[in-house]
Regions:
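Hydrophobic transmembrane alpha-helices of multi-pass solute/ion transporters
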Residues: 2, 9-10, 14-18, 197-200, ...
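N-terminal signal-anchor module of multipass membrane proteins
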Residues: 2-87, 95-107
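Juxtamembrane interface elements at the cytosolic ends of transmembrane helices
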Residues: 6, 39-43, 47, 193-204, ...
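Membrane-embedded helical hairpins/re-entrant loop segments and their flanking transmembrane helices
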Residues: 21, 47-66, 70-85, 264-337
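Hydrophobic, membrane-embedded alpha-helices of multi-pass small-molecule transporters
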Residues: 22-34, 183-195, 212-213, 228, ...
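Short, non-helical or kinked segments that cap or interrupt transmembrane helices
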Residues: 59-60, 81-96, 144-152, 209-216, ...
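Membrane-embedded alpha-helical modules
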Residues: 105-232, 342-456
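Terminal cytosolic tails of multi-pass membrane transporters
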Residues: 431-507
Length: 507
């Protein structure tokens, strides 16, 4: 049995405890503050980048909330083999944003109607989610193919690719490009204001203020935009009282080449879920080894896949387990899964009211851009941390250098591989897939040194320990019996060659 170590006292409320109503509600609201902005942002980004109508974008936002509520309910209640039985919160997966934009953008260039674009994107997501469900039964084998180096490269490429989307919104968005107002002083000033507010609150000593920094930054930016007359409320007119979820509202379409592209990201999301569920088990004082833990892992990943099936059918981008909430558990000392039931109900209720989804479409692009630039940059940094966490020898350097070279190269000129067959070109023209596929192939082909093989074997049995009381620097992992090397206070720096568990950080 693995052991966990905490600097502070035990949890106030353990996993199966039932806190009083008020404390349960406050705990739920605290978790919502940590995930709400990242939950609705992907739909807003995809809608803006593809020029989708306000009605469709708002529906995607509403369904994201409803699907997240359903997913959270399944995770915390653990029905048979489905769910982790932990306070695992589901939310929209940022990893799919660039893929959706690339696929939708290509279809838009071909003159395809927006509803058919949406139905294809959701159809691909629907089928791809079954990959996640199947992966829940072969987790040990999958982790040997998609190593920390591979997942780190993919996360790094995701962050770098998304920064372009963020900086476009920072300057006024795609609509400003069309109208010739891109990069105006008020756009840049508003984006910088939001950026500075987020940075300022993330420097706070209060964990709650740090976690709420993005939401506060958006509120300040929205208020200033309102005073400058930059907010258009026309989207809030003549709204129905309730949004009725309609399965496959825009139809069901499927594209095999698009499925191959999205499938790579789905496999990565499996390892994200593994890392997040492991962290949640640790802060909840549950075993992180043994049969019970393996049931939690497979159940959590199975729920991830099932919920993404449901989400895609309803009209939401794919979901995943969020890591931010582990910081909230650590901060509040409340690990009760009954808090998750409140979160689930609140999310579903919010999604049923169309005014909530429509409100987010009124946020000016520069306000969103100011938040997105720093959010996506942090995703890229998280990818770099994942890469170095497993040690960085000559072999890993070659894998990362080659993968980044091809991935970034494709982002600069996607036509470089246009001579390849259409099916292959569809995969490698996307920077994330080009970098990820290169990393997977090189990881399988390049021989490992004896020292590296020993490190990987040691990493099979890891001990996850708490490093800091800061919710934004929560965990690392080490081989059982190996000491951690730290430099002063705060999080220890990874030691080159030190074996650590495959884990994806989510910002």
């Amino acid at each position: 049995m693995s052991k966990t170590t905490r600097k502070h006292s035990d949890l106030i409320y353990e996993l199966e405890d039932k806190p009083p109503f008020y404390q349960t509600l406050m705990g739920a609201v605290t978790h919502l503050l940590a995930i709400f902005v990242p939950m609705v942002t992907p739909a807003l980004i995809v809608g803006g980048a593809l020029g989708l109508s306000t009605e469709i974008t708002a529906y995607l936002v509403s369904m994201a909330m409803i699907a997240s509520g359903i997913g959270t309910w399944l995770q915390v209640n653990r029905y048979g083999p489905i769910g982790s039985g932990l306070l695992s919160i589901q939310s929209v997966n940022f990893s799919f944003v660039t893929v959706m934009i690339a696929l939708g953008g290509a279809m838009k260039k071909d003159g395809i109607h927006e509803e058919l674009i949406v139905s294809t994107l959701l159809g691909v997501s629907f089928v791809g989610a079954f990959l996640v469900m199947g992966s829940s039964f072969v987790l040990p084998y999958l982790k040997r193919v998609i190593t920390p180096t591979v997942s780190g490269v993919v996360v790094l490429m995701i962050g770098l690719s998304l920064i372009k989307v963020g900086i476009i919104d920072f300057g006024g968005g795609f609509s400003a490009m069309s109208s010739g107002t891109f990069g105006k002083y008020e756009h840049i000033g508003l984006g910088l204001l939001v950026l500075c507010v987020i940075v300022a609150f993330n420097c706070s000593r209060s964990p709650l203020l740090r976690m709420s920094g993005i939401a506060i930054g958006l509120m300040v930016g929205y208020a200033v935009a309102l005073m400058l007359g930059m907010v258009d409320f026309s989207a809030l007119e003549n709204l129905p009282l309730i949004t009725v979820p309609i399965p496959f509202k825009y139809g069901f379409s499927f594209d095999f080449h698009a499925f191959m592209l999205a499938g790579t990201i789905y496999l990565l999301s499996v390892l994200e879920a593994v890392g997040d569920i492991t962290a949640t088990a640790m802060v909840s004082h549950r075993d992180i080894q043994g049969p019970e833990f393996q049931k939690r892992l497979s159940g959590g990943v199975l729920a991830d896949g099932l919920v993404s099936v449901i989400a895609s059918a309803l009209g939401s981008l794919p979901l995943t387990t969020f890591a931010q909430n582990n910081g909230v558990i650590q901060m509040t000392g409340v690990a009760s899964r009954h808090v998750g039931k409140f979160i689930a109900v609140i999310l579903v209720l919010l999604g049923l009211f169309p005014v909530v989804g429509r409100f987010f479409t009124t946020i000016p692009s520069p306000v969103m851009g100011g938040a997105m630039v720093i959010m996506f940059s942090m995703i890229a940094i998280a990818g770099g941390r994942i890469i170095i966490s497993h040690g960085f020898d000559r072999r890993e350097t070659l894998i990362v250098a080659t993968s980044l070279g091809l991935g970034l190269g494709v982002s600069y000129d996607p036509n470089v591989f246009k001579v390849l067959p259409a099916g292959i070109y569809m995969l490698v023209e996307n920077p994330i897939c080009a970098g990820g596929i290169t990393a997977i192939i090189m990881n399988l082909v390049l021989p490992q040194s004896r020292k590296r093989k020993a490190a990987v074997r040691d990493a099979e049995a890891v001990e996850v320990i708490q490093l800091s009381d800061k919710p934004d620097v929560i965990f690392t992992a080490r081989s059982a019996g190996q000491p951690l090397a730290s430099k002063g206070e705060g999080s220890p720096e990874p030691v080159p060659g030190q074996a650590v568990a495959p884990q994806v950080e989510r910002i």
